[in-house]
Structure formats: structure tokens, C-alpha cells
Curated annotation (Swiss-Prot):
Cofactor: how and how many bound: Binds 2 magnesium ions per subunit.
Cofactor(s) needed for function: Mg(2+)
Molecular-function annotations in GO: ketol-acid reductoisomerase activity; magnesium ion binding
Designated name of the protein: Ketol-acid reductoisomerase (NADP(+))
Annotated active site: 132
The gene coding this protein: ilvC
InterPro entries: 6-PGluconate_DH-like_C_sf, 6PGD_dom2, KARI, KARI_C, KARI_N, NAD(P)-bd_dom_sf
Keyword Repeat assigned: yes
Keyword Ligase attributed: no
Family: Belongs to the ketol-acid reductoisomerase family.
Amino acid sequence: MANYFNTLNLREQLDQLGRCRFMDREEFVSEADYLKGKKVVIVGCGAQGLNQGLNMRDSGLDVSYALRQAAIDEQRQSFKNAKDNGFEVGSYETLIPQADLVVNLTPDKQHTNVVETVMPLMKEGAALGYSHGFNVVEEGMQIRKDLTVVMVAPKCPGTEVREEYKRGFGVPTLIAVHPENDPKGEGWDIAKAWAAATGGHRAGCLESSFVAEVKSDLMGEQTILCGMLQAGSIVCYEKMIAEGIDPGYAGKLLQYGWETITEALKFGGITHMMDRLSNPAKIKAFELSEELKDLMRPLYNKHMDDIISGHFSSTMMADWANDDKNLLGWRAETGETAFENYPETDVEISEQEYFDNGILMVAMVRAGVELAFEAMTASGIIDESAYYESLHELPLIANTIARKRLYEMNVVISDTAEYGNYLFANVATPLLREKFMPSVGTDVIGKGLGETSNQVDNATLIAVNETIRNHPVEYIGEELRGYMTDMKRIAVGG
């Protein structure tokens, strides 16, 4: 199979990359009605599979789960997830032929095998759904021409999809129809109904494309969302320990600090996050973030280039074929890092202390968000997509670190995201360790500036504020956050 994106001409590539429109709520007045009375069969019952299925059932859809016969016979976790929640469970051969919509929610590396297995069983004119387009875009899966192919991609982990639905809301969601597979012209009706059934329409849906979703998703998760948090955690912890800061305090400052800092980011963007600092600390964080942007821009651009060209995907798929040797090795190495093994502590850290003593963390967040956004938009991805795949998802990923450090982050994200995270962090960590960290001290990570006055030069502060507030990610962020009027607050501080 050929990489689908690479079969397109330049005009088609740019058109697909630039697809992203925030949809009016009026476009969802019929909610999930288009799929009511039809049979939805989900393949896979992990976090996304189970939680999307629960939401769809609660929205009035007929949902069942098709699993491999071995998973049923051995009563694996996927079988238990579905059965314990009262769903019908059957083999592919039993359930797939009845399905009007087959939703493939298995891990990326299983997609080719799953689709090749279920496609011959699907009835003529049925629909096939994805929540990530890697199989279509990067692997170039050829799907029967009578089948409609759609995507509904919630912009958060599966557990959050369920929790937001239960509180009467939802999570922002990208939806798309594969242009090669919409024979009856009903793709958008199916995608909108599926998105509404998960609750996504209440938080806002973006009309996107398979290409835009995949390329922006890969870039965000490799760099700012996962790779930067991993590299930052490792080098900041090392620095604090080397400077004599208590290991328990250093670890807790990082583990819960990312979550606390990005909580401010979620509600008011980079501007509000930086405003949580004192004037001297804000100027210092700004200066550090500018240095970081200069240092790390080539690395961010390389990841974007490798994603656009397909080099990243081919490299990762080669590791799939080698039994995930690199992935598993990098996972083990991460588990051995000092940050992952810092001693538990009962030390109290106030919310503001995370900002005051984590100035470098704030700088890393600003630099990482802006670099990822800039790399994406320079490659033809439009601002809305770039925002959701950088700034918007960052608090959700930071929350996983707060739960169980880097281990939890790498468990919750997909194998594709985990592989890309390691590729980035394995270069970013020594880069920061050698070229940046020697020049910083505990005044910006661990102890704070200890200033007795908030006084700064007015002209300098005005210039810093203008630069922060006039970045394009702040403009689109303010617009998109306006659509999300009921965002859930998360606990901060551990």
C-alpha cells in the first residue's frame, strides 16, 4: 500500500491540509437521529472503544462489540469491558455482516489487519469509521468503493469523552469524510450523527479531513504534548537534584506543576498563563522561552518535515515489523529515569508556588506551544487544527503525568504517540541538558526569584506583553475557547 498523502499532487495536499471549519451548532439539530434504528458495531473495547460506545448507547443508538474469537474465548479485558457494561459481544463473523456502521477503535498498528479482516464481512453500502486516520493516510489502506469511510476524532483520552458526556457536555471533536469513499453522499450525515452521539457537538466540532487530522495529530503528540513534557521533566529534575533540592519536592513540583500551569493555559491561553507570574518572573520566563525557541526550532521543524514526507510513519512501521524493539526499549529506559523514581513526599505545594518556583516550566510550555503551532501552520495546516493539536490538548496530557508520572502518560496515549514522543525526547533531552540547562539555576526551577519588589521597567514589560498576546495561537485560541463555554475545571496541586 502506498502512503495516500504522497499520492496526491501539491494542490490536493494543501487543500486537504487546510481543511478545518468550526461547525455551527445548528448543523447538529438532528443530533444522532441519522443513526437511530441502525446497527453500530464497534471493533475494539479499550478506552476509546468502551467510552464512545457508552455515550452512543446513552444517546439512543444500537451498539454492540465485535471481538476476535480468541478474545471472547479467553475472556480478555476487552471482552470484560463490554460484557460488564451490558453490551452484546460477538465474533467478527457474527456481528459485522449486520452492521450499518463498523467503528474501528483498535490500536493503530492493528488497523490494517482488522480492516482487511472485517471488510469482506461488511454488507454492501455500509460505513466504516475511524477515530484516527493513520491507516488511511499513512498506510494507504484501500477500502471497498461501496463503503462510506468517516472519522470522528475526540480531542482527548477516552475516559474524558465519557466524563464530559456524563456531565451533559462533551469534548471538541474533529470529523471528516474520506474523499475516496463517499459513494452515496451520506458521509457527513453519518459523521455528524456519530459525533453527536458521543456528545462532541456540545463542545464544538471541526469539519476537517483525514489528512489534516493525521498530520497535525502526529506533530502535536510528538512535540509539545508528550515529547516536550517528557524531556522537560527529565532535565528539570536532574537540575534540581544537582543543586541540592529535596528529591521529593523536585519531583512533586514537576509531576503536578505541568498540570497546574496548563490549567491556566486552558482557560486563558499563553497570556493568562504568563499573567500568573510576577512581573520580574514573567520577563524572565519570556526571555527563557525565546532562548528555547531559537534552540529547539530546528528539531520541531524536522519532526514536521518527517511527518509531512511520511518518513516518520515508515520508520515507525518498520519498528512494528520488528516487534516494537525500539518502542519497548525506549519505554524501559524511561522507566529508569530519576524523575520516574523520585521518592513520595507529603510536602505541601500551593497552587501559586507551582508558578513561582516553576518559571522554567512556564517558559517551556510557551516555547513548545508556539513552536508546534508555527511548524504546523507553516506546513499548510490551518490555525484551528494547529491550536487543537498543541495548546488545547496539553492540559489533558499534563493531567496524566499528575496521576502516575511519565508512565501514565505513555500508557494512556496511543502506541503511535508514544513512539513519536520517544523520538523527540531522545533528541530534546540531551540537547537541553548540554546546550541550555547549564546556564539556568534554581531561581527559575525549584526556588523562585525570591524578589522583594514587583517593579520592572515599564517599556520592557509592555513589549513582552505585546509579543505574548499578539502570537497567532492567542488569536485563534480566544475565538475557539469562546465556543467552549462549559469547560470542566480539573483539580490542581496533587
